[in-house]
């Protein structure tokens, strides 16, 4: 480490780095300003207070009150209290987390810091996510010539063992399989998808019950439903390009990127109006 280097700004992300700003504030010799970005307020970094004894914070820092969250020590709260500025990943989510319904108990802290708190929408690397130049695709296309998208759909169907069907809608999901993501709604509407002569491809992993449910659906409806439990970067590109619509039914979503990828690839995002999806 270069001990002579002094940063102007230290930018920390989520609860894992929540103590960074507190350590900067603890030592007046550190002149760097701090920014703390919340990606998901549901993860608060809670630990028993007995495990905080060796962290080295003094009473001068308001320890333990400034770190306390309903009897626990919260790394996230430390980031919210001590950072000079706070951001989150979309303007809508920034408004939502100030409410009792979406604040996960931190809404009071955020209201107290409202002058220093803002939402900045996530972006996408258009050099990587570009259907005109994407080397992961069997055919490339853009808004001037979308003929390659039909070839991508055919390739996706072949890759996942689906029936070749150019006319029926192909719905895609690229997601962590978790209750937050609302994917039980996809399972509940599977009959409607099949009634449209539609198909469903799921790429993701997460909660065992959802993994098992999508595996069962794929076994029951071979040729119409397929899933890949896990994550594969190449498959994610091919799925976004080959789908007609991408399903993003999240119950809450700080930002999300798949809907932005879908728009980039001419794939219709079907999303709940919440957070960064709104």
State the predicted function of each range.
Residues 1-278:
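Catalytic cores of nucleotide-sugar-dependent glycosyltransferases that transfer UDP/GDP/TDP-activated
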